[in-house]
Amino acid sequence: MIKKDNTMNLDVKSNLAKLLATENITIQHNAVKTASFDVKNRVLTLPIFKQKSGDVYDMLIAHECAHALWTPYEKWEGITDSELRSYVNVIEDTRIDKLIQAKYPGVVRNYENGFDILEKQNFFGISGKDINKDFMIIDKINLRSKSLNRLPFIFAPKDNDWLAK
């Protein structure tokens, strides 16, 4: 919720997160680059942006609450290789985003608008790049998911196995 003076009520956003997560998770608003969820300790950390957008915040909250609902701590902690963990995180993000959007269809619009706002700010680093030539398959999967399949990716036939998962 954005107040009339264009400030964001962080208490309201914290309560929204607890409702979406369906538990009394701990909420922190810190000077971090992006949101995160500590699956073990049940702590959601949200960034404090200079330019606030309700859609971006709601998208981040929904995504991190999806981790609260569906990311299994034991399996996640068992992945010790950092490169493998990065790949698994992209696949997990794709999986849980589909689940949260099915559980709470109203957040789909937040995802669309939030992605558009972040893309305009070049948050994803795609400005001036050929998304079909300059990105690895895992980055393409990540951006395809985050954009809700709205970016014009062309995948090689060998990539279809990854896309099916």
Placement of each model-derived feature along the sequence:
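Short, functionally important secondary-structure microenvironments
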Residues: M1-K165
